Amino acid sequence: MKKIILLASTVITLFAFTTLTNWKSDKAHSQLGFSITHLGISEVNGSFKNFDVNITSSKDDFSDAVVEATADIASINTGIEMRDKHLAGPDFFNAEKNPRLTFKSTSITPAGKNNYKLAGNLNLNGVTKPVTLDLWYRGTIENPMSKAPTSGFQVTGTIKRSDFNLGASFPAPMLSDEVKIKADGEFAKQ
């Protein structure tokens, strides 16, 4: 009987230390943005208005986090409606055929205090490629309004649009091949 109680206690203790916690992005305090160089002399910025990001982790420092993100391509916003429609069309993202972009992390590796390399698979325009992004964990506080634990993150990196068949008829220097990604977010513990 003592062995059964000891075994049960061990299992419960191990489960308690490996419980996964879900964190959901606070849309009012999060953004998924990008920038691209135009004609080699200026930056054009944009974002996706409709997106979701979820993080699952069993550690307080998020060193074992799994990040999953989706965005509606048709929600692309550069501030110019005509350009947004062109970007959502077949020359670039082809939102009708590929309505969402997705990202799912495959690993997270420490890269200094509160910094990580976030590797994962990005599916964009029907093409899936591995990417590695920089993740900065900005800390966790108790949100004074909701009283919920809230964590902040920033993700940055660069992808090549040619890897995802985006705008092939618009070569550099008209549009740079490199697209900078910048996402900022607050995440509430669920």
Tell me the role of every PLM-derived stretch.
Residues 1-24:
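Bacterial Sec-dependent N-terminal signal peptides
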Residues 17-190:
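Low-complexity, acidic/polar, glycine-enriched regions of mature
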